[in-house]
Structure formats: structure tokens, C-alpha cells
Amino acid sequence: SFDDFKSAAILIGTFDWSHEPLHALPDNGDGFHLPATIVHELTHALGILTQVSITPNGQYAFMNDYFGLWGQGLRDSNGKQAESGMTISIGGTDFDGDFVLDNDTYYSGVYFTGNHVQEVLGEGTTLSFPEIGLEQYEKLVPGLPVNGAEFDFEGKIFFPELSHIELQNGLLSHQNWRNWTIPMEAELAALQDVGLKFDRKQLFGYSIYASGSEDKLNEFTNTNGYYARENGQWLVGTPNETRLGIGLHIYGSYNKVTQAADILTVGEDAVGIRVEGVENHLTIDKNISIKSDGPRGAALLVSYGRDHTINLEGDVSALGEQGIAARFDFGDNILGNDQEYRGSWLWQGGYATADRILSKINGPLVKVFNVSGSLRGREAAIYIDESAFVEEINILSGATLEGDIISRWDPDNPK
């Protein structure tokens, strides 16, 4: 029995498990991604976890004996900090200093904050709760959105779960569709805020969580590169060797980003630049190198959203085994494609209905991809997955391409 264990154990149940290794994008088909699940559960064991109890008068409260740094970083829908023993109000009513959830649904205005998280998000950045097909919750929060009330595993008890970071499609979320196999940088920052000590920059060069608007793009020149690390410092010009590392991650929407520093990696499954969100404009400057030359590397990966514009003026390469220089691909769902499947204008299973489509995928993944620089990939210079529609590709004067151009786009694909 579990009572006999002298060390920790993770009980994950029986599913149709896929043992596919961790890659930049999941490739597990209809199976439930076992390695990604283990990473998810380990983050709970490492401290991203809320424990609640029921008081004699029937209210939920934060447990006194299991209230740590994660609990201290939680804020309710009014910005109030959680405290040990504080009662929790589900439904927006504040009784004598309760920790208030705006409503009794999955999204209720709760968020997590800490010094490391704020360092990653940047001053003044607010985040929305992700679009997953439920009735939308429009509130913006100055931290990491956290899930609210959920049913327990038996579907009997409705309780404040408060243990999952709700970044769009994130590994550490409770969303029904997730295409991340590793934590995003802001999630790693949360682990630092709950006490773990590690060099976050080994895995992420820089991340952009801020958003502009349709009327006014958020303009940013990224002078942060990605190289090897030593004693917490960049070794400029030396490629990073970290597996699954990412040089630049664009999470927010309506950004106009110019990449003005080299990104150099030879790590397995590493990514130069990963783009998500809606209507982001990315320019890779002339004389800038984005190199992801390790096995299964992707120099440019556009993995979610719609209507992005990419201008490639520099030197982009993925010269390792199975390397793809420019990859346009939503990837699989770590819960299995039979649970929910997404792509450009594609939404099946889960909360999907026949008469609507999620706004963030209601359009081409990429509106225009302009190439005037160098694009070299060992497996492909350009790869378009069956899930992803790229509206326009322009190979301009002065461009150099080495490698295949592969398009598998299929709006009726069998997944």
C-alpha cells in the first residue's frame, strides 16, 4: 500500500499512454503523453500546489499546515494576498476578509505573482485567462492566471483547486488542449518563486508576454541573444547546448518585434524563436543569425494563433539531424488528439461546437512569410504541417534556400 512508501510517489492512473520523448512540439497522436505528464506532476511535488480544508461551518480555507510560498504568491480577484487559514469564497461575495473567487467557474480572477514572475512578465504586463472554449472570463490580471473552482477526480466535490497556471496551452495548466511539453519561462519563474534555485536562462533567452492591440502594436527591439551559459553569464558567440532550450518566445499578441541579437543553439529539440498569440509581426534583422543546429532543431517555430507576419532578413539555419529551419505547426495535444484537436480553422472534440471557432485560430497561422535572407534546413528549409495554413510565402531578391519545402496543410486532415 501507499502507506508503506518511505519516499514520494506520483499516482497518475491508467490511460492510453504514449511514451514519445519530450520534443519541442508533442507528437503523441491519440495517446496521453506520459513524459509530459510526469513533468507536470513533478511541478506540483516541487511546490505548485494548494491544499484546502473545510471549516466546521462548511467553508473552504487554506490549510495551516500546508501553506507555503505558492500560497503566499496567490492573489484573489480583488488583488488580496492569500494567508494561512484564510477562508475562501466561491462566487464573488466577500465575507470578513475571505479570499474571493469572482465566480464558481474555472476562471475566477485568481493569479500568482512573485519577484521572478514579474521579472519575466515585465513592468505593467497583464495577462488574460486563456481561450479554451468555455464561457470567457475577460478580466486581466498582473500575474500568472490560476485556475479557480473545479470538481474533484470523482466528479463529486466542487472545490477551489488553485494549483494550475493557466497560460494558453501551457503544460502546467488544466486546459483540454496543450501543445507545450516543457514549462514556459514564466512557469519556470514561478518555480523559482516557490524556492527552487536554478539558472532559468539556460532554457530561455528571452520571453515577451506583453501585448499591444489591433489599433496599436507593441513595438520592441530584442537585443537579448541566446548562447552558452557559465556562472550565470552569457558566453556570447558560443552555442547553447541545453536540450529543449528556446532563444525567444513570443507569447503575447499584437507585437512588432525586431530580433537584433544572435540566437545560437546546438541542443537537441531546441528552438530559436517560438511564436504564438495573434497578429504578431517578427523581423529577423539583416546580419543576425538564428541557428538551431542540434538534432530536431527548429530555428523558427510558429505553433499557435493566427495572422502572424514574419520577415526573415538574416541567416536562419537548422542543420542538425531532422532540422527544420522554418516550421509552421500546431503539434499534437499532450492529452491526445482524440480529446481535442486544433489547427488553422480546426477545432474538434473537447468544448468544440459545429457553429463556432476559437477566435485565436480563426484564420491562417501565418498571413505572410517574407524571405530575403538565408534559410537552411537539413530536413526542410520550410515545413508546413497539416494543421497549419500559411497564406503567403514570398521568396524575395537576395534570398538563399537550402533544403526541401514541405507543405502538408490539409483542412480535412484525419486527426
Residue locations for each model-derived region?
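A generic structural micro-environment signature
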Residues: S18, L69, R75, D94, ...
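Extracellular zinc-dependent metalloprotease catalytic-domain scaffold
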Residues: S1-V39, H44-E219
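Active-site-proximal helix/loop capping residues that flank conserved catalytic or ligand/cofactor
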Residues: E185-A189, V271, G403
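Surface-exposed loop/turn motifs in large extracellular/passenger domains
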Residues: S213-E402, W409-K415
